[in-house]
Amino acid sequence: MLSVILLAIALAMDAFSISITKGFTQKKIQKQEILWYGIFFGGFQCFMPIIGYVCGTTIRSFISTYAPWIAFILLLCIGLNMIRESITSSDEKVADIFSFKEVTLLAIATSIDAFAVGVTFAILNISLVIPCAIIGIITFLFSIVGIFIGKKLGDYFGDKFQILGGVILILLGFKILLGF
């Protein structure tokens, strides 16, 4: 259960970072807009592992022998990508308006990692219900909290939290590989 919570926190870091930035840049963000960010980010993070699981289930029988290595490589790549993105994208500008199109695109972009985690769940034959619920709830909460933090503190912490998320994914990859 601790691994699922740590994974959920790691996956939520992209949405959290973006939420901090949105809180900082959208000076007049409304409460319902804050709720929409949480719903979209949490919803996509909840359902993308399911889509990844369905895709991963079709290939499970072919690669079950290599599952720990595949999980490790997927999580390592995702974690390294999160760290790389946090280092290279710190100068992005974010608009001061709310749009469903933008929040949808942001939710998709921040949940691609969750898709890969779903593939890993299929390879390792891990049940989806509880992990997906935890991932969605934690992302929902982190998104809302991130906007409030962004409103108070600005976007200073955004990239650092994304680095932490990448490190957690890499550590989970090693945990799976080593069989702990």
Curated annotation (Swiss-Prot):
Q: What does the record say about its membrane topology?
A: Multi-pass membrane protein
**Which Pfam families has this protein been placed in?**
Mntp
Q: Which domain of life is it from?
A: Archaea
Q: Give TM regions.
A: 1-21, 34-54, 63-83, 103-123, 129-149, 160-180
Q: Which InterPro entries match?
A: Mntp/YtaF, Put_MntP
User: In the UniProt record, does the keyword NAD occur?
Assistant: no
Could you say which protein family the record assigns here? Belongs to the MntP (TC 9.B.29) family.
Source species of the chain = Methanosphaera stadtmanae (strain ATCC 43021 / DSM 3091 / JCM 11832 / MCB-3)
Q: Report what the protein is called.
A: Putative manganese efflux pump MntP
Q: List the keywords (alphabetical).
A: Cell membrane, Ion transport, Manganese, Membrane, Transmembrane, Transmembrane helix, Transport
What does the UniProt function comment say about this protein? Probably functions as a manganese efflux pump.
Q: Where in the cell is it found?
A: Cell membrane
Give this protein's Gene Ontology molecular function annotations: manganese ion transmembrane transporter activity
Q: Name one GO cellular component term.
A: plasma membrane
Q: Show the HAMAP family listed in the entry.
A: MntP_pump
- Predominant localisation class: membrane
